[in-house]
Amino acid sequence: MVHIFTSILLGLLLLATGTRAQFQFFEQMFGGGQQQQQHDSREQNVPSDSDWYQRTYDNARCSNYLCPGTLACVAVPHHCPCQHPAVEDKFELGDGSAICVSKGGFKFGEAARKVELARKGLL
């Protein structure tokens, strides 16, 4: 009787150990390891809160106008540069403001023409 009980207990112990190892494998493959990867990439990325931007904005020295998108110091708001000048064209509107629009692969001046058509309600 003791021999049967010991055999059953040993069998359950081996089964539990094998099951645990199997679940650890699946956890590592489908989720557990992902948390570690996310943790590593979060250490390399800029935080998603606005504290860094707010500190940089507050510490910027500008006697004229500080552009909120680029933190450039310019004389008037419509002189602010585009955030991504390689892929954006700046278009100054007649009311003293300016917008940056995607070049979108258009030829030179095409973005400005489309903005003007949109302002007239033709696009």
Swiss-Prot record:
Q: Tell me, which GO biological process terms does this entry list?
A: ERAD pathway
Keyword match Acetylation: no
InterPro entries, sorted? LCL2
Keywords on record: Signal
Q: Which residues form the signal peptide?
A: 1-21
General function of this protein: Probable component of the endoplasmic reticulum-associated degradation (ERAD) pathway.
Similarity-based family = Belongs to the LCL2 family.
Read off the PANTHER family from this record: LONG CHRONOLOGICAL LIFESPAN PROTEIN 2
* Protein name as it appears in the record: Long chronological lifespan protein 2
